[in-house]
């Protein structure tokens, strides 16, 4: 910017420089060394604003305090700026005809690439920049439209070189022929080239089909918003309809649709797979029905497998001629594939009968469960005591529902039945039949039920004593008539006159001695006692039984103060029951036997307790003996250690 280098400036040039921003001040206020003497504009607002003034580039910005940037226009293109045509005279037209003066600061011609930093407002080189300081794309609409549509992206349009300067009349008059004649010629030539090169653009045609998305593009419409890669592709998009691409498939279309041979093979494969799946489902359904009926056999599947094998064999591809010469293993393998309904989906290592394996597993599970049930039942037999056999079981009068339940009917909760009504009907219908049931227990239970139903309040002391006396009489009668029971643990003789008292745990020697005495005296005492009691069993039991029944009925009537509830079989046992005397005697005998069994069980439990006490005592003695031995050993060890320490 030296005055010696530049020619003398006139008033117009001075005014233009005062409106042009100082490039050094735009970079930094301290960069410009001239300060207030600088002939260019120093605007802080323009320095902070990166946008360029559009009016400045058009040559008509009249605001001296414009907040937009006014970059220099003459040094960017290598020629001085000329004013507008309306502001200059005719002799001044010859000024642009002068030869362009290169920038003396740079000394080299500028390149045809616009400066990126200048467009962002950050170029600090100014006139020394080797790139063109061009405005942004919005600065000149007409050349910008021409560049995007028709000109290649890499070659700038000649009109762009003068876009930073003021446009003159000659440029404006010559621009329309240059802009609008080229599209007509290119479109005309493009249609001819389009017909010649239509079949050579298969890849681009498939791309257009995906880009259209179902919409047609008219032939006369030009895409101004996207620069096309080449002239031929742009014309193909604008001038050819969708139908031509469909009617003329390209070699690359096989990538999307596939060949005809592939489609045929795929359809045959799908049909064959569907046929196999359908037949396989029918075959599996048939096997499941047979398996659910618990009659699964391979012979039932013979006909179905044969039909399925023939149908699948007919649907398969023809086998080669060398199939007949194959060995036995290959034939078996093929036969297994034909028989397996899932041969089309499962590999050879899975060619097995799934239903057969399932049935075998089910059968093995059933056998294991049955064996486990047998073991558990044998273990629980000694722990769980089943209900005693009742009169209904002995007479075969078990209800039909319990008989239907089988052997587990006794383990299930018993059903509530009217024992009194059934007992009364049985006594009336079969008075002479040998009833060896539990008549006495049933009568006592009936009386207890009657007492529970007719309970009116607490009983007096006399009633309780009478009931206790009746119970003692019944026990004495049962002890006289009951036989001597023998168990596996201990044999005892029950006698009401000499009862066995439990004095406490006894040693093992005393228990064994008592057992030997019982075994030796059993043979002699059993026969004599049986003969003594056999004569008076029937008469005594009859009398005791009748007395007990009368006492029970009397106590019920006295305790309630009203007519007591009497079951149908609690009628007066007088002459009406004279035919059933034998039945009553046998019932009393059975009741005494049950009492004996209960006493035997209690005696066995006492014996178990005694044995446990004896075993515990022996173990304690043995433990004490071991403890003494351990103490002696410890003393010996201690003495030995002390001796070692002393020495």
UniProtKB/Swiss-Prot annotation:
GO terms for molecular function: DNA binding; mRNA binding; zinc ion binding. It comes from the Eukaryota. Residues 86-106 have a biased composition (Low complexity). Signal peptide: none annotated. Residues 160-175, 189-203, 369-379, 435-445 have a biased composition (Polar residues). Residues 267-280, 347-359, 419-433, 527-536 have a biased composition (Basic and acidic residues). Keywords: DNA-binding, Metal-binding, Repeat, Zinc, Zinc-finger. SUPFAM superfamilies: CCCH zinc finger. The keyword Zinc-finger applies. Residues 78-106, 155-280, 308-327, 335-452, 512-580, 586-605 are annotated as: Disordered. A zinc finger (C3H1-type) spans 16-45, 47-73, 109-136. PANTHER family: ZINC FINGER CCCH DOMAIN-CONTAINING PROTEIN 19 (PTHR15725:SF23), ZN-FINGER, C-X8-C-X5-C-X3-H TYPE-CONTAINING (PTHR15725). This is Zinc finger CCCH domain-containing protein 19. It comes from Oryza sativa subsp. japonica (Rice). The lineage of its organism: Eukaryota, Viridiplantae, Streptophyta, Embryophyta, Tracheophyta.
